A protein has these predicted regions:
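Metal/cofactor-centered catalytic core regions of large enzymes
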Residues: 1-272
């Protein structure tokens, strides 16, 4: 209550440390919708935000998959997924300056543009993580021991999933066809080609399969964003919403009010 909308952004990093970039984007979109500018964001900003969200999704699923595999005795998969997750954090650090507490979005845009060569590194990552996903698939999906320990285990029915308030892959694992990116498209998701996987019985095996396929679809989205990424501004051109650049504020006091300055040239005021 005692902060501006932008000052609250660092708190969103802590809501889910596995996907801080997605938290940043969700909060910014909520405030922008209240301000009535969510449909006015620059196209480049929207593409970069989608890239951030899908990187966050891959990062979270890699940890979930690795920890899950280790819990059922497949340590090798854990090592593979954490190796790929480290690459995600290297990309995030190059983009935001931090690995976890990113604080990357701003109301009306982003804190900074993509650094030079970053999309090339992202393209390299999508190829490498795709190979890692398929390697995990070979190790687990048709592994009899893994199937015995996950199939029919932890079943959550459709009604239970709704009653429990489940979201994301845990909800879709119970054969509920609901994903905000399709049900209520935001940013530029309606311009991208991707599919949403759903489970059949709602057991641990279904939830595993969904996370695997969601990572494949995230890679698909990232590749499209890299190919279509437009040039242009990353922030709204609205001084009432977007803060001036920090370098300008430090060098020119008037930048705080976007160069609006009253100048007196010493004329005498009219009589009366």
């Amino acid at each position: 209550e005692n902060m501006t909308y932008n000052q609250f952004i660092p708190y969103t990093d802590r809501l889910d440390y596995l996907a801080p970039l997605a938290n940043n984007v969700a909060y910014a979109l909520a405030v922008e919708k209240l301000l009535g500018v969510d449909d006015k964001l620059p196209e480049r900003c929207q593409y970069i935000r989608v890239i951030c969200c899908e990187l966050a999704r891959i990062s979270a699923h890699l940890l979930g998959l690795g920890a899950f595999a280790m819990d059922v005795g497949a340590l090798t998969v854990f090592l593979h997924t954490f190796n790929e997750r480290e690459k995600v954090y290297n990309l995030i650090e190059a983009l935001t300056g931090a690995r976890f507490t990113t604080t990357y979005t701003r109301i009306g845009g982003l804190s900074r543009d993509l650094p030079d060569g970053w999309t090339d590194e992202l393209s390299k990552f999508t190829k490498e993580v795709s190979e890692a996903i398929e390697e995990a698939d070979k190790l687990l999906t048709r592994n009899k021991i893994f199937i015995d320990r996950t199939k029919g285990v932890g079943v959550i029915t459709r009604d239970e999933a709704i009653d429990f308030g489940l979201t994301g892959p845990n909800l879709r694992g119970s054969n509920i066809e609901y994903d905000l990116r399709k049900a209520h498209p935001y940013l530029i998701y309606d311009q991208l080609d991707f599919e949403i996987p759903y489970g059949e019985v709602g057991d641990c095996y279904d939830r595993y399969l969904i996370r695997m396929e969601e990572m494949r679809q995230s890679v698909r989205i990232l590749d499209q964003c890299i190919a279509k990424l437009p040039k242009g501004p990353i922030n709204l051109d609205d001084g009432k919403i977007v803060l001036p650049h920090k370098q300008k504020v430090l060098s020119s006091m008037e930048e705080l009010i976007h160069q609006f300055m009253l100048v007196s040239q010493g004329q005498n005021a009219p009589a009366g």
